Curated annotation (Swiss-Prot):
Residues 60-85, 143-154, 210-490 are extracellular. This is Glycerophosphoinositol inositolphosphodiesterase GDPD2. It catalyses: sn-glycero-3-phospho-1D-myo-inositol + H2O = 1D-myo-inositol 1-phosphate + glycerol + H(+). Its cofactor is Ca(2+). Residues 224-479 form the GP-PDE domain. One of its GO terms (biological process) is lipid metabolic process. Belongs to the glycerophosphoryl diester phosphodiesterase family.
Length: 539
């Protein structure tokens, strides 16, 4: 569709130069936007939406990114916190797509052609491929993160609605401009139907929004208790006695850890199947780096340092570096035995919850690792009530021999003959839980792993009893959810947002109509003047 030359101001020409990389003024025959240019504009808009969606996904995934770091370490053997690099790359993609889209919209308003340069086209295709690869990888390797996104919408949907209403008001400018330039009735009606169909969906979206943080303040449940995930891993090396003490200082009530059984039958604290991430096994036993953690004897495990790695690698981005006494204490940490942990926890008035890792098949205690661990707990002479027993293996025997221990059940079930009193589930299961009904049945719910204030606030509003976290010092400082609004207030916000957006839409279309009439009148006057000049010269 041919277009008039439009404004020839320096500003418009600069915009055109940035978009098309043509620094010379376009000849009159090129002052038009072809169908191919329109297709590339559509791809640009799609790329912007994809990159913006990926940014949102990335911000949500920051809560679980430590698992991604550990996954890559197990694959590559090199530790790196990918949080900063991840955010930087996504931010660059969104910034580039946003600037290019703004240039295109401004050029459209200035009636300049949308001749996208080949370099921009290649970069847009690369961004689309990169985002698509990220989404496919997420679906293959971490499908549970789709459930994380579903949970996040309960916290962000009210604000996304406001942002969408503002975005559609801005998008109305080029839509109205295009509408008044189209002369055929069919395409004009189709454009209006598509645009206002999207507007209607956005305006009515709050009808589908359900968030536990939309409630009366008087109905806010008590703040969830804190469970230290492997202790306080942002303040001390994970699964160490120092981490246990830092957990108590954070105000947490439970220390969550991982237990393995050594080759000579001593239960000890360790999460990974190999010792290379959290100990100096490479320097002490260089030929056994890939050996299973349970294949080491307790005498060998006591020779390992379990704290120096924490000072060298800084496993969590944003965590403050240790200094002074804390640094010296971290440097001297060793692999603790379960018996040591129980005695220290009893002195600190902390409860213990642990996962029990099955040893390899050729292990001496492959069939009896549960009994070996239970014997250690019973011989420690600590109150049984301070132990939360999580493993499902041989649970009936454990209940019979240690009836005072609190049995906590996970997603995989457990004892079918007894109603559970404690549930330990991933936070992604929140939409599947009826917290109020569980509380009526005297069932306590702990969700893991919760590191970000937005997620903690959401679970607080939902009435969760406790959360397992890596960042107990941050969550301890929270005195109130990040946001909490009453249903009446949210209704007012919804109505005001839609009304303001509607007025902006109407104003935009009326203003664009006025501009079109003004341009038409100016063009008619110019044509009359040129005709008179031409007639005068012919005389």
């Amino acid at each position: 569709m041919a277009e008039s030359p439009g404004c020839c101001s320096v500003w418009a020409r600069c915009l055109h130069c940035l978009y098309s990389c043509h620094w010379r003024k376009c000849p009159r025959e090129r002052m038009q936007t072809s169908k191919c240019d329109c297709i590339w504009f559509g791809l640009l808009f799609l790329t912007f939406l994809l990159s913006l969606s990926w940014l949102y996904i990335g911000l949500v995934l920051l809560n679980d990114l430590h698992n991604f770091n550990e996954f890559l370490f197990r694959r590559w053997g090199h530790w790196m916190d990918w949080s900063l690099a991840f955010l930087l790359v996504i931010s660059l993609l969104v910034t580039y797509a946003s600037l290019l889209l703004v240039l295109a919209l401004l050029l459209r308003l200035c009636r300049q052609p949308l001749h996208l340069h080949s370099l921009h086209k290649v970069l847009l295709l690369l961004i689309m491929l990169l985002v698509a690869a990220g989404l496919v990888g997420l679906d293959i390797q971490w499908q549970q993160e789709w459930h994380s996104l579903r949970v996040s919408l309960q916290a962000t949907a009210p604000f996304l609605h406001i942002g969408a209403a503002a975005g559609i008001a801005l998008l109305a400018w080029p839509v109205a401009d295009t509408f008044y330039r189209i002369h055929r009735r069919g395409p004009k009606i189709l454009l209006l139907l598509l645009f206002f169909g999207v507007v209607l969906v956005i305006y009515l979206a709050p009808l589908c929004i359900s968030s536990p943080c939309i409630m009366e303040p008087r109905d806010l449940p008590p703040k969830p208790g804190l469970v230290g995930h492997r202790g306080a891993p942002m303040l001390a090396p994970e699964n160490t006695l120092m981490s246990l003490r830092k957990t108590a200082e954070c105000g947490a009530t439970v220390f969550e850890t991982d237990v393995m059984v050594s080759s000579d039958g001593v239960p000890f604290l360790m999460h990974d199947e190999h010792l290379s991430r959290t100990t100096n096994v490479a320097s002490v036993f260089p030929t056994r780096i890939t050996a299973h953690s349970s294949d080491f004897s307790w005498t060998e495990l006591k020779r390992l340092n379990a704290g120096s790695w924490f000072l060298e690698r800084r496993p969590f981005w944003g965590a403050k570096p240790l200094a002074g006494p804390d640094q010296k204490e971290a440097e001297s940490q060793t692999v603790p035995a379960l018996e040591e942990l129980l005695e220290e926890a009893a002195a600190l008035n902390l409860s213990i919850m642990f996962d029990l890792r099955r040893p390899p098949q050729n292990h001496t205690y492959y069939d009896t690792f549960v009994i070996q661990t239970l014997e250690t707990v019973l011989n420690a002479r600590v109150p049984q009530a301070m132990v939360f027993w999580l493993p499902d293996e041989d649970r009936a025997n454990v209940q019979r021999r240690a009836p005072g221990m609190r049995q906590i059940y996970g997603r995989q079930g457990g004892n079918r003959t007894e109603r559970p009193q404690f549930l330990n589930l991933p936070y992604q299961d929140l939409p599947l839980l009826d917290i109020k009904a569980l509380h009526k049945d005297n069932v306590s719910v702990n969700l893991f792993v919760v590191n970000k204030p937005w997620l903690f606030s959401l679970l607080w509003c939902a009435g969760v009893d406790s959360v397992t976290t890596n960042d107990c010092q941050l969550l301890q400082q929270m005195r109130y959810p990040i946001w909490l609004i009453t249903p009446q207030t949210y209704l007012i916000i919804w109505v005001i947002t839609n009304c303001v957006s509607t007025m902006l839409l109407l104003w935009t279309f009326l203003l664009q109509r006025r501009f079109v009439k003004k341009r038409g009148k100016t063009g008619l006057e110019t044509a009359v003047l040129l005709t008179r000049i031409n007639n005068f010269m012919m005389e």
